[in-house]
Amino acid sequence: MSSLRLLISDSYDPWFNLAVEECIFRQMPATQRVLFLWRNADTVVIGRAQNPWKECNTRRMEEDNVRLARRSSGGGAVFHDLGNTCFTFMAGKPEYDKSVSTAIVINALAQLGIPASASGRNDLVVETAEGPRKISGSAYRETMDRGFHHGTLLLNADLSRLSNYLNPDKKKLQAKGITSVRGRVANIHDLKPGVTHAQICEAVTEAFFAYYGERVAAEVISPDAFPDLPGFAETFARQSSWEWNFGQAPAFTHQLDERFVWGGVELHFDVEKGHITRTQLFTDSLNPAPLEALASRLQGCVYQASALQGVCEALVSEFPAQAAELREVGAWMAQAVR
């Protein structure tokens, strides 16, 4: 049996692709070297320890139907579209070495006439007349007996959209997470017009084969049917869940304040693992009872727009005279946490 494995995904679903990556990584023999090539439609991918409400403009993502996907590696937030080519290299230890996979990608780009070099821990850059421009970023994960290196190559990404989804409102919240570093980036297509996703994949594949001195047929992973991978359905369910993508955020606080016709409301939330653990309420409303009840009921609530509105709606039967105010507060909170 060959020590190499080449997988290519036909899916643009980030949860599907990350689930495939996770399953292959868990189940591969320690003697195998794997190359997985894939790409995602409109997605913000965040690091394992990041807070999506801090790193992303979650409201605009929802409006534009952009998905959020939490990966199992560390690092910062990145925006993926079909102008990104994604790669994952996996190997058992002690052979796993991210400098090897970095060299394979650099060699592949060189074959396409793109002179890239490594910069810092995670990036590949190309020198231009305006200075170095980042064309690739990477992240890594290691366990006791294996490791992987995955990253993106900016082929023809819509760079104007980066700031749409990776720049949250300044006053939105204060968090204990990790802040992403946004470098100066460029598309490969601008540096070498005409290069396609298929050419990038072929070049990386050939450089992979050349380094290890053997070849293997590609396995195409299709979204039309779940891959024949043990535990894939469960892994996909977890990868696509709100609990993983949002609920795994580090603890943070969120302060909301608004003035309504009937009075001002200020709410302070402490949030852990996607649930409200503490709520403080301040208001000059002439009838604070329904708002005090709301603050109490929000303890333990999922930090999700529909859940917050649901708590307000449930209080309407107890405070029918303040139904309009409660619904107004519910809509305001829902808008604030999207």
UniProtKB/Swiss-Prot annotation:
A biological process from GO: protein modification process
Sites where the protein binds (R)-lipoate: K134
Location in or out of the cell: Cytoplasm
Recorded superkingdom: Bacteria
UniProt entry keywords in alphabetical sequence: ATP-binding, Cytoplasm, Ligase, Nucleotide-binding
EC number(s) per entry: 6.3.1.20
Pfam families referenced in this protein's UniProt entry, alphabetically: Lip_prot_lig_C (PF10437), LplA-B_cat (PF21948)
Catalytic activity: L-lysyl-[lipoyl-carrier protein] + (R)-lipoate + ATP = N(6)-[(R)-lipoyl]-L-lysyl-[lipoyl-carrier protein] + AMP + diphosphate + H(+)
Keyword Ligase: yes
GO MF, one example: lipoate-protein ligase activity
Broad class of where this protein is predominantly found: cytoplasm
Miscellaneous comment: In the transfer reaction, the free carboxyl group of lipoic acid is attached via an amide linkage to the epsilon-amino group of a specific lysine residue of lipoyl domains of lipoate-dependent enzymes.
PANTHER family linked: LIPOATE-PROTEIN LIGASE, LIPOYLTRANSFERASE 1, MITOCHONDRIAL
HAMAP family in alphabetical order: LplA
Role noted for this protein: Catalyzes both the ATP-dependent activation of exogenously supplied lipoate to lipoyl-AMP and the transfer of the activated lipoyl onto the lipoyl domains of lipoate-dependent enzymes.
Name of the featured protein: Lipoate-protein ligase A
Native source organism of the sequence: Cronobacter sakazakii (strain ATCC BAA-894)
Gene responsible for this protein: lplA
